[in-house]
């Protein structure tokens, strides 16, 4: 339960401040001559969060203080440079990182390391190519022997900051790496990665001896909560609105440099675990997810409608449909449901392969050939997606059976036998 009551005016003020930044970003996006855009995307940015609905609970004998709120409805644009969507993405990333980190530290007994990798500041014209190169260089780094031996899983987050005094940009990586707990007891071993060693290796893969600023350290904190709080630093924004909203030139530079780039990557053992996490309907990670605090009964709706540079607020009692939606819970599927889904996907793969074999362009004219080639391309993409999902499901079946919340099979043996994976 929320420990400190919030004033409605403070909730409205916080959303309004964010909305004004969003409007400025939308205007820069619309006015840019350097960005490829569509009228649909421009409109989506301009109208993002125009209507926000919260379910709220009032403090006793108050119609201004609220003790809890939960988002009921919102329209979003999902643009990386929209500050409202940035915040939502950061919250989701924080949940993902916390849950997966807990899984690795509790199930695998791994321990987290923080790594920072930088390059010297660069100009705006160099930013796009520099980020592309950094993404390739970090892959080279983690393929080196010492890193492969030690790093079991790692999350790479790109951040770009700007020096306003000399108008240069500073792209850098924050990395959360997971190592076996014995790593910290072998500081004198050849496989231990020191700061000088990390600097030398990063200079070599980057082919840049000017690099001086790198760091590697154990996640610190007196309590488990303190250590988890440090881990969440990884979820902060890739680019701050105070930087990219400084001018049209800066906005264009950062937008084009970051467009299409993967700014957070889950690697090593996390490459498959993140895929499992994304399709989890079976409670596989439930015990590792942050617990939501119990809320008081939510009784009213706070609706914010953006109009002429302000949010107009209205408060009314929740209707029956809204109450039902708030009370709705999603039931976990069982291990039997998982097995059925696996065989359904196997059947889809078989059907796709059959369709691919049947396509023959030998006697087709140019128009027919183009249609068939496009169909073949789509089928091959579908086949690849099926294969990837099946591999992830096989990983779950062989490694995570104990984590199923609801089980219909009598044993793991029966489960694997039913899936024909013994």
Language-model regions, residue ranges each:
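Cys/His-coordinated zinc-finger cores
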Residues: 175
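Right-hand nucleic-acid polymerase module
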Residues: 1-169, 179-422
């Amino acid at each position: 339960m929320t420990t400190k009551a919030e004033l409605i005016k403070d909730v409205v003020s916080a959303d309004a401040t964010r909305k004004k930044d969003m409007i400025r970003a939308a205007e820069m996006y619309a006015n840019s001559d350097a960005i490829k855009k569509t009228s649909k995307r421009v409109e989506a940015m301009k109208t993002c969060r125009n209507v926000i609905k919260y379910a709220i609970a009032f403090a006793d004998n108050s119609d201004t203080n609220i003790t809890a709120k939960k988002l009921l409805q919102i329209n979003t644009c999902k643009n990386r440079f929209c500050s409202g969507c940035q915040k939502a993405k950061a919250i989701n990333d924080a949940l993902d990182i916390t849950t997966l980190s807990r899984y690795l530290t509790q199930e695998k007994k791994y321990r987290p390391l923080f790594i920072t990798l930088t390059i010297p500041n660069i100009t705006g014209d160099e930013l796009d190519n520099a980020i592309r190169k950094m993404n390739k260089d970090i892959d080279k780094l983690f393929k080196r022997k010492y890193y492969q031996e030690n790093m079991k899983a790692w999350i790479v987050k790109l951040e770009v900051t700007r020096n306003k005094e000399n108008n240069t940009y500073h792209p850098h990586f924050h990395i959360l790496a997971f190592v076996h707990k014995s790593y910290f007891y072998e500081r004198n071993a050849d496989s231990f990665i020191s700061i000088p060693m990390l600097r030398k290796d990063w200079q070599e893969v980057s082919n840049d001896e000017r690099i001086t600023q790198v760091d590697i350290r154990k996640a610190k904190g007196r309590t488990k909560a303190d250590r988890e709080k440090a881990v969440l630093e990884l979820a902060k924004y890739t680019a701050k609105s105070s930087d990219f909203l400084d001018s049209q030139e800066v906005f264009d530079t950062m937008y084009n440099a970051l467009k299409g780039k993967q700014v957070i990557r889950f690697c090593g053992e996390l490459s498959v675990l993140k895929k499992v996490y994304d399709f989890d309907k079976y409670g596989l990670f439930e015990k590792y997810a942050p617990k939501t605090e119990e809320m008081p009964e939510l009784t009213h709706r706070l609706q914010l409608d953006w109009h002429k540079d302000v949010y107009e607020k209205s408060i009314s009692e929740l209707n029956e449909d809204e109450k039902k939606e708030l009370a709705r819970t999603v039931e976990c599927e069982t291990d039997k449901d998982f097995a059925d889904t696996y065989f359904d996907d196997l059947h889809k793969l078989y059907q796709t392969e059959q369709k691919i074999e049947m396509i023959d362009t030998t006697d087709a004219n140019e128009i027919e050939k183009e249609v068939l080639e496009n169909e073949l391309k789509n089928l091959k993409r579908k086949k690849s997606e099926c294969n990837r999902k099946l591999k992830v499901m096989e990983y779950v079946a062989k490694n995570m059976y104990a984590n199923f919340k609801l089980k219909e099979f009598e044993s793991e043996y029966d489960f694997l036998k039913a899936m024909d994976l013994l």
